[in-house]
Amino acid sequence: LKPKDLEEIPFSLLIKDCSVSFMNHKRTCVQLAVDIAKTMVANFGKEIKVDMDIMISGAILIDVGKLLEYEIVDGKLGTSDYGKIVRHPFSGVAIAARFGLPPGVQHIIGTHSKEGDLGKRTVESIIVHHADFVSFEPFKA
């Protein structure tokens, strides 16, 4: 995939005829996460702590593994051979670790999708998980 592809490819292959781009979904997810976190801090004050830097970084990068999971062949977007056996939360964590990103960011990347349902999520990961699904699930309805 090339940078320009991200404004054109659908954000998910799980939604038939999805016309929402990868980058549009990404911007929406980040904005939702920030809005949720700010609202929670405004209403709950000291009762909740959100590391905004970690949360925003994680929200931006949750789908970085899709750059390995997806490929364009003959002008058509599909799942790469790699992506057929390694989903984007796993490859995304590997990319983040390779570049020395903090464990909190890696955690958000690894737990933002269904793979995170079996373990513990940090506050930041919970917020990003829900922001991601709010900007995903309605397109499956």
Functional labels for PLM-detected ranges:
Residues 24-28, 87, 122:
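Aromatic- and histidine-enriched alpha-helix N-cap/loop-to-helix transition segments
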Residues 44-46, 50, 55-56, 93-97, ...:
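Histidine/acidic-rich helix-loop-helix segments that form or flank divalent-metal centers
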Residues 1-78:
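Acidic/His-rich, divalent-metal-binding segments that scaffold phosphate/diphosphate chemistry
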Residues 39, 81-83, 130-133:
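Short, surface-exposed linear patches
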Residues 25, 62, 88, 112-113:
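Histidine-centered active-site/metal-ligand motif
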